[in-house]
Amino acid sequence: YISFNTTAEQKLARKIFGMHMAPHSIVSVGIELSAPSDWAVTQEKYNLPDEYMLYVGRVDQGKLNNVYTYFLNYKKVYPNSDLKFVLVGKQYSDPFNHPDIIYTNFVEEQEKTSIIQHAKIVINPSLYESLSLILLEAMALKKAMLVNGNCNVLKEHCHKSNNAALYYTNEKSFIDKLHMLDSSTNLRLEMGEKGYSYVNSNYDWN
C-alpha cells in the first residue's frame, strides 16, 4: 500500500507506474512547532536583519536552483529595498559571498520558530518536493510564501490555499512576485491569514 502527501505526488506516480501501481491514498500530516526562542537573543546570535526573505532547509545548489541570482537581480531592480536573504540549515555547497546574503547554519528548533516568525517572506525554491513542511510551518505562523511554480506540489499548495503562497516560474516572475510581497504589508497579512486557515483545515493532527 502506498501513501501520498499530495495530489500532485499521486498524479506523478500514476503517470510513471500506470495500471501497475499498488493500492494508494493521500494521507495528510500534522504540523507541530516548537515554542519560539527569545527574538532579541536569537537576532543578535545570528546577526539577523530586521527585514529578510527566509529559506529553511538543506543549503545546496540543487535545492536553491537560481534563487541567489534572482534575488540579487531583484535588489538591482529595486535598490531601495532593505530586504536581505537569510538561509537556515546545514551548508552542502560553498556560501555565496554577498552582504545581502546571511547564513546561520544549523539552529535549534525554538530558534527556527522565532526566525520564521520574524521573516518578512518565506521562500521554497526547490524543484522537487513531496509535501514541503517548511511551507506548512510558515503558513501556520501566518507568513506569506513565495515558491517555485515549476514544482507541481508547491504550485498545488498555492491553488488549494487560495493563494496563501505565490509562485514564480522564471526570473521575471520571481522579481515581480517578490516586489508585490516586499512592498505590501496588507498583501502579506492577507496571505498569512489564508495560509493559517489552510493549514488548520488540512494539516492539523486533530
PLM regions and their residue ranges:
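A short, active-site helix/loop in glycosyltransferases that binds the activated sugar's phosphate group
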Residues: 1-23
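Conserved donor-binding/catalytic core segment of Leloir-type glycosyltransferases
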Residues: 3, 46-64, 71-72
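Acidic anion/phosphate-binding donor-loop and adjacent secondary structure
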Residues: 14, 26-45, 49
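Nucleotide-activated donor-binding/catalytic signature segment of Leloir-type glycosyltransferases, i.e.
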Residues: 89-113, 121
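Aromatic "clamp/platform" in nucleotide-sugar-dependent glycosyltransferases that forms part
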Residues: 127
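Short hydrophobic beta-strand element within catalytic cores of glycosyltransferases
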Residues: 144-148
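Conserved acidic donor-binding segment of nucleotide-sugar-dependent glycosyltransferases
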Residues: 160-172, 180-185
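A short, well-ordered alpha-helix in the C-terminal region of glycosyltransferases
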Residues: 180, 187-201
